Amino acid sequence: MSNANFNRGPAYGLSAEVKNKLAQKYDPQTERQLRVWIEGATGRRIGDNFMDGLKDGVILCELINKLQPGSVQKVNDPVQNWHKLENIGNFLRAIKHYGVKPHDIFEANDLFENTNHTQVQSTLIALASQAKTKGNNVGLGVKYAEKQQRRFQPEKLREGRNIIGLQMGTNKFASQQGMTAYGTRRHLYDPKLGTDQPLDQATISLQMGTNKGASQAGMTAPGTKRQIFEPSLGMERCDTNIIGLQMGSNKGASQQGMTVYGLPRQVYDPKYCDAPGLLGEDGLNHSFYNSQ
């Protein structure tokens, strides 16, 4: 199987732009540090081109076997391309079992087809960090923090629900003492008056304002009949036909002689004409006079 079956052609357009951006993230200084570490761990020289020296997967398999013996049982001689790909695949599976996170691991084509050398470099740095965490003398990468597990009793966990963290803010030593739930009746009163407990629902605290001694005595509910009269005239509550002076005055006029609605009205002037005559049931003309 020839190399032409695995190597891609030149990239154009958006693919070329993405490839150039990935290439710009590649760090030559990190490459030199990786070279020193890998050559020191395996005892083998990589060569002038760093990525070409790792492309067959032989040095990578030897590296993981040094860090964790027996990780790769068989290392293929790089006779054909599929041998190289198999070596790279064995290395990737081995470092995953070693503890490298899956999102830090490159794909085989990233190295074999030279598509993403930056990701290959990141994977080797993650492998160095994992080796340093496990106690190997590696001058590259960072040591991961060890997991610190704590087990608490269920009673302790329930008590923690009553504690408000500082990230929620502070109430400056205030409390909710005396607060009621939503929808509960509120008994308002002024403690300065010496009343320990609220008297009734009509007692309003001073923080609600003051009514200056006024009360709601004599007030009726909406829709109730109102008995209107003028107490300054000495009148008592007689009936609903008496209108108080606050409603205006009719100047002594009365409704005497008024008829109910719908009756006919006989209109005439007694100075100029006699009283109007009406025909009775007997067919005769009868005169009616005003009685004064």
Curated annotation (Swiss-Prot):
UniProt note on tissues of expression: Smooth muscle, and tissues containing significant amounts of smooth muscle.
Calponin-like repeat positions: 164-189, 204-229, 243-268
Family annotation (PROSITE patterns): CALPONIN_1, CALPONIN_2, CH
GO BP: actin filament organization; actomyosin structure organization
Assigned GO CC terms: actin cytoskeleton
GO MF annotation list: actin filament binding; calmodulin binding
InterPro entries membership: Calponin-like, Calponin/LIMCH1, Calponin_repeat, CH_dom, CH_dom_sf, SM22_calponin
Listed PANTHER family: CALPONIN, MUSCLE-SPECIFIC PROTEIN 20
Family to which this protein belongs: Belongs to the calponin family.
Name of the protein in question: Calponin-1
Organism, as annotated: Gallus gallus
This protein's encoding gene: CNN1
